[in-house]
Design a protein with these regions (language model features):
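Hydrophobic alpha-helical bundle signature of multipass membrane enzymes
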Residues: 1-112, 121-149
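Membrane-embedded catalytic cores of phosphoryl/pyrophosphoryl-handling enzymes
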Residues: 101-204
Length: 204
């Protein structure tokens, strides 16, 4: 619903308003986004983190199953949302704000790549599974996806509805995999290897 409202009413107004963002703030948004891209593996591949999480899940599956399940859940959510966002870009073909303005006419199906936001999907698809597993840490976890979403809109690379759609997509994928994997809330990641716990049981 928020995405539809954004497309219908808010997108052009918000895009024109953020076009007045001070230069120093734009620099901060761009540099901050660049730093996050490096930290989260964008120079290697936009999908690198998802594959790393899945590989780590496979490595830990036998000896540290709780940790492996968390890695599998987060990795599957992240990779699926990231891939889905990329495919939807090709489906909707929306122009970016700097391409569509000032004569905004919806800007869909014109061979663009704005809707939904890949950057926003990248970070929201990490936030939602972690927030579902560790609700007590939701607020600090929220910092990165919010920063990236605001930054992408502020620098004119995305409309408001682009990042809202990415958040909604990531939430749906996270909840879907939570149901499939039957992930409990506040999952406890135990540091003790399975072999060690079995040994303790035998001694008892």
């Amino acid at each position: 619903m928020l995405t539809l409202l954004g497309i219908a009413f808010l997108d052009p107004s918000v895009a024109r308003w953020v076009a007045q963002t001070p230069a120093w703030m734009l620099v901060a948004f761009r540099q901050g986004t660049t730093v996050l891209e490096v930290v989260f593996g964008f120079p290697v591949s936009k999908f690198a983190l998802g594959f790393v999480l899945l590989i780590a899940a496979a490595v830990f599956m036998r000896r540290r199953r709780p940790l492996a399940l968390v890695l599998l859940y987060v990795g599957a959510t992240h990779l699926t949302a990231r891939l889905a966002a990329g495919m939807l870009k090709n489906v909707f073909g929306r122009e970016r704000p700097f391409e569509a303005l000032p004569d905004y006419e919806g800007a869909f199906f014109v061979d663009g790549s704005s809707f939904p936001s890949g950057h926003a999907a990248h970070f929201w698809s990490l936030f939602f599974p972690l927030a579902l597993l560790f609700p007590r840490y939701r607020l600090p976890l929220l910092v990165l996806p919010l920063f990236v979403s605001v930054a992408r809109v502020a620098v004119g690379d995305h409309f408001l509805s682009d990042v809202i759609a990415s958040a909604a997509l990531s939430a749906l994928v996270a909840w879907g995999f939570a149901y499939i994997f039957r992930m409990p809330r506040d999952e406890r990641i135990e540091a003790v290897p399975v072999a060690s716990k079995e040994a303790v049981t035998e001694e008892a």
